[in-house]
Amino acid sequence: MSSTDTLSGQVAAADAEILLAQPRGFCAGVDRAIEIVERAIAMHGAPIYVRHEIVHNKYVVEDLKKKGAIFVEELEEVPSGNTVIFSAHGVSKAVRDEAAVRGLRIYDATCPLVTKVHVEVAKMRQEGVDIVMIGHKGHPEVEGTMGQVERGMHLVESVEDVRRLELPDPERVALVTQTTLSVDDAAEIIGALKAKFPAIREPKKQDICYATQNRQDAVKFMAPQCDVVIVVGSPNSSNSSRLREVAEKRGVAAYMVDAPEQIDPAWVAGKRRIGVTAGASAPEVLAQAVIARLRELGVTNVRALEGIEENVSFPLPRGLNLSSAA
């Protein structure tokens, strides 16, 4: 069968193969955040409240709901005396203070690499330095980082924003970035900031996290070998969206799916090489489900590409040790 409307059967080219990006899927921060929720439920019983989606992935959130997690956007939705978990994206100082004042039991699932940026911001503001943050307006990580201090933060999303930016003292300025940005886009904006503010201070180590960079590099390597790329990730996942953009910028059609049934057979019709990757918040079970769906469409071979092997882990918060959660 050759119709692109076919639900299964031979749609892809007869010799089609799947190329699997390496690395892909969960990063250490996401693994840690999910484990924090699961252990908190095991220790304290359901329900456990989580402020914002623990990570931006529908499958993960729905799975944790079944286990007893309740996701809220504001602390006022958490009844007094209950447990609240801050999502991997981090929260503002005001949210943290409110939770403490209300006497809520707090577990902080903020990714340690996001916390590193929070520490940088607080330190530089204590020194009287204005801070330019490169990030996406409205993203919870950006709101959390901007909310570490009361003033002196300036958000830019583009080179054009940099052109319009005016600061009180161009000699006392520093930059930080959202951890899930496009490495290439961030580099362009950083270049514009350096040109406009030559004295601008950069972090000793870039804020874009290792997992974001590794997954983008893997797509840069994979995309030129592919006729089409499928990214496993939810629409509200910043890092997953960046992977799709990275492939598209290399001239390859790229699509993002939350579930295998979202794959349009027309995407792979007649295609010989189909790249598959997954955002840092997307579980491997979804990537494997996508592979299974592509097999239904006639792809018989799967080839894992070479790439970086990640061996990163982060410690859990105090009180969530193995013996307590057993």
Swiss-Prot record:
It holds the Pfam family LYTB. Disulfide bonds: none annotated. Binds 1 [4Fe-4S] cluster per subunit. InterPro entries: LytB/IspH. The gene is ispH2. One of its GO terms (molecular function) is 4-hydroxy-3-methylbut-2-enyl diphosphate reductase activity. Its cofactor is [4Fe-4S] cluster. The keyword 4Fe-4S applies. Belongs to the IspH family. One of its GO terms (biological process) is isopentenyl diphosphate biosynthetic process, methylerythritol 4-phosphate pathway. This is 4-hydroxy-3-methylbut-2-enyl diphosphate reductase 2. [4Fe-4S] cluster binds at C27, C111, C209.
